[in-house]
Amino acid sequence: MPRAVHAFAWGGTLLAALAVLLAAAAVEGRGPWEGWDEGRELRRPGYAERVWPDRPIRTRANTFSNLAYMTVGLYACGLALSDRRRARLAGPETSAGNVVVATPALSALFGLSCLWLGFSSGLFHASLTRAGQRLDVAAMYPPLLSLLAIAAARALPARVGRRGNASVPTWALLAAVVVLAEIALWRWKWSMSATTVLSTLIAAMALVTVAEHLLWPGRFRSAWLGWGACLLAAGIACRQSDVARSFPVGPDSWLQGHALWHLLTAAALGTLYLHERSERGARLHERSEQGARLHERSEKRESSSDPSASEASRIEGDRIQQERS
């Protein structure tokens, strides 16, 4: 990964943290949330962290831990900019076969969704207002919707409509669907179960990734899925123990169960994005399989009477596997 992407992500996260600290210091003692409708968690906390009703940031750990979503979002946006620059310099053929790399707008869509989640969830945990809660819950969905949009883009043509200038990029239509879905989920937030919607999206994402591995075996790095599943399971465990008040820390600790939920689910979203980004083109995949077959063939022929042919086959297999990497 380019160093500039790391600098972009961590530099942006640091700036966001400084902005929150400066804003909180500027309104300290002024009651910035007065006049806002209180959320249920202000008087009846749903999480174990201590609530400070008179402070600009009413729950510290649960607020600042949302920077993790912003870091993931900034990484995705940074990679989108890097992919766009690389395509301009080296040509679009360098990313042939990888939908995410070839379509920087999809990375930007996912990145902006994570940034929106970090902002909305941070606003809720800082304010504990009803409006903040509505944004927080609705913002949970766009990152998963964006990942589903990436999978859909892989199965659809790059452009939709008539040939020529009249056609529309598929990514633009998918982005519009994600935005409209987010608006609808925000609009009807109070009339639906957030647990049901989120569980449905997670299940849909799981089915889609399994289908990708069945349709295109070997073209994705499945290890990212394993990491994502472990991180999600750990995040759920931390969240549930926090709600049950069984997480082994005090209410003033920065290591809260719900804060770890933010950190771990942000990391899980990052691994799912990297899984979608790990796609290899069909041609490269075929050549890697050919190299593996030549390697196996050379091992079987090591004891044959023609060592030169075995050595040539082994060298050819090594060359193809080096091209793969």
Segment roles from a protein language model:
Residues A282-E299:
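Long, intrinsically disordered low-complexity tandem-repeat segments
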Residues P2-R280, E323-R324:
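Multi-pass alpha-helical transmembrane bundles in non-GPCR membrane proteins
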Residues R301-S304, R324:
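Arg/Gly-rich low-complexity intrinsically disordered repeat tracts
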Residues T94, A282, A292, A309-A312:
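Ala/Thr-enriched low-complexity intrinsically disordered regions
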Residues Q290, Q322-E323:
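Long, compositionally biased, helix-prone stretches
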